[in-house]
Curated annotation (Swiss-Prot):
InterPro entries: Ribosomal_uL5, Ribosomal_uL5_bac-type, Ribosomal_uL5_C, Ribosomal_uL5_CS, Ribosomal_uL5_dom_sf, Ribosomal_uL5_N. It comes from Wolbachia pipientis subsp. Culex pipiens (strain wPip). PANTHER family: 60S RIBOSOMAL PROTEIN L11-RELATED. Pfam families: Ribosomal_L5 (PF00281), Ribosomal_L5_C (PF00673). This is one of the proteins that bind and probably mediate the attachment of the 5S RNA into the large ribosomal subunit, where it forms part of the central protuberance. In the 70S ribosome it contacts protein S13 of the 30S subunit (bridge B1b), connecting the 2 subunits; this bridge is implicated in subunit movement. Contacts the P site tRNA; the 5S rRNA and some of its associated proteins might help stabilize positioning of ribosome-bound tRNAs. Belongs to the universal ribosomal protein uL5 family. Keywords: Ribonucleoprotein, Ribosomal protein, RNA-binding, rRNA-binding, tRNA-binding. One of its GO terms (biological process) is translation. This is Large ribosomal subunit protein uL5. Part of the 50S ribosomal subunit; part of the 5S rRNA/L5/L18/L25 subcomplex. Contacts the 5S rRNA and the P site tRNA. Forms a bridge to the 30S subunit in the 70S ribosome.
Length: 178
């Protein structure tokens, strides 16, 4: 649905709004990166299994494990220890995930009022976090041992934050300070 919405409506409206001479200049979604940090995995090797499976079911794609780049004694982490998992979504899986995120997961988040415009990075990319991964319907609440958060990065081909914001607004992203 999102991909069709983008092709049919959003490209035309953004082309008119920003006076692009070519359709290829219109900003588009490039990829969505989802990261789930698992601090417990540094001491317990089996602690990564459940978040790994949860992220796999949320994204619909197998995640990769992330490892510590250096040792930090304050966090009891050694270099090379597993500290989380991540997945990068592109094309159809990306659009499916964003649709589930906007219409199902975000409305189920506690105290969610929308995103701030300050979450753009200055180059047209948008990053935010979700406090509870149980907002997704794919997660069975009875089978999880701990509620975890997720970091989500949306990478666009937009040159500026203004263009990226218009793209995300057209995709029905909830911003509270327009």
């Amino acid at each position: 649905m999102f991909k069709q919405l983008y092709k049919d409506n959003i490209v035309k409206s953004l082309k008119d709004k920003f006076n692009y001479s070519n359709v290829m200049q219109v900003p588009k979604l490039v990829k969505v990166c989802i990261n789930m940090g698992v601090g417990d995995a540094a001491t317990d090797n089996k602690a990564i299994n459940e978040p790994f499976d949860n992220l796999h079911s949320i994204a619909g794609q197998k995640p990769v494990l992330t490892f510590a780049k250096k040792s930090i004694s304050g966090f009891k982490i050694r270099k090379g220890a597993t500290v989380g998992c991540k997945v990068t979504l592109r094309r159809n899986k990306m659009y499916e995930f964003l649709e589930r995120l906007i219409y199902i997961a975000l409305p189920r988040e506690k105290d969610f009022r929308g995103f701030s415009v300050k979450q753009f990075d200055g180059h047209g990319n948008f990053s935010f976090g979700i406090k509870e991964h149980i907002s997704f319907l794919e997660i069975d609440y009875d089978k999880i041992s701990k509620i975890r958060g997720m970091d989500i990065n949306i990478i666009t081909s937009a040159v500026s934050d203004k263009e990226a914001k218009e793209l995300l607004l057209a995709l029905k992203f909830p911003f509270f300070d327009n």
